[in-house]
């Protein structure tokens, strides 16, 4: 018996389809697809969520110095004129240094994040901003399932598809 369903496609196409379905599931919370694809996506999604739940709180915080340009009331950079050694004048942007707290992944969480990212595509929202689905998985989805042992997804049968009568299902995060 094969480890994964073949889905009637070559390996590269099959992985691309599964990767896009897993990405859509984590981005939207639910997907509508055929039963065979849904069973494969469910298997992959359950494993990724289990990894994220295990490594959910495995990070440290550290202080980082951040340099940023000073802005005036209109949002423009504040500049000063300086003279070089040979007498030329040039503009220099004023900068301010702040210290911010930044989260740093521990090695096992970093490995888990990279495993998860291997199954997710980069996606953008309607305004064109990039959404980091790995962050969403570790920061929003995994904490909801902290006390749950498996069963993170649910499948509903919605009947056969018109045209080829393939059994269609809705796969959603519980």
From Swiss-Prot:
Protein name as it appears in the record: Large ribosomal subunit protein bL17
- Organism source for this protein? Acetivibrio thermocellus (strain ATCC 27405 / DSM 1237 / JCM 9322 / NBRC 103400 / NCIMB 10682 / NRRL B-4536 / VPI 7372) (Clostridium thermocellum)
Extract the Pfam families matched here.
Ribosomal_L17
Which family does the entry's similarity section mention?
Belongs to the bacterial ribosomal protein bL17 family.
Q: Kindly state which keywords UniProt assigns to this record, in alphabetical order.
A: Ribonucleoprotein, Ribosomal protein
- Per the record, GO CC terms? cytosolic large ribosomal subunit
What GO terms in the biological process aspect are recorded for it?
Answer: translation
Per the record, the domain of life is: Bacteria
């Amino acid at each position: 018996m094969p480890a994964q369903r073949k889905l009637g496609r070559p390996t590269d196409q099959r992985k691309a389809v599964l990767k896009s379905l897993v990405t859509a599931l984590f981005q939207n919370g639910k997907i509508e697809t055929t039963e065979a694809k849904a069973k494969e996506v469910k298997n992959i999604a359950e494993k990724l969520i289990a990894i994220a739940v295990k490594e959910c709180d495995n990070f440290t915080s550290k202080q980082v110095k951040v340099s940023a340009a000073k802005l005036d009331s209109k949002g423009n950079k504040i500049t000063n004129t300086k003279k070089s050694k040979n007498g030329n004048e040039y503009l220099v942007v004023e900068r301010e240094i702040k210290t911010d707290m930044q989260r740093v992944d521990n090695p096992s969480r970093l490995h888990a994040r990279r495993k998860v990212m291997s199954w997710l595509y980069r996606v953008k929202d309607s305004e064109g901003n990039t959404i980091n689905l790995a962050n969403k998985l570790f920061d929003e989805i995994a904490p909801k399932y902290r006390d749950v042992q498996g069963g993170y997804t649910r499948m509903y049968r919605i009947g056969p598809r018109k045209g080829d009568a393939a059994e269609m299902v809705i796969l959603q995060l519980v």
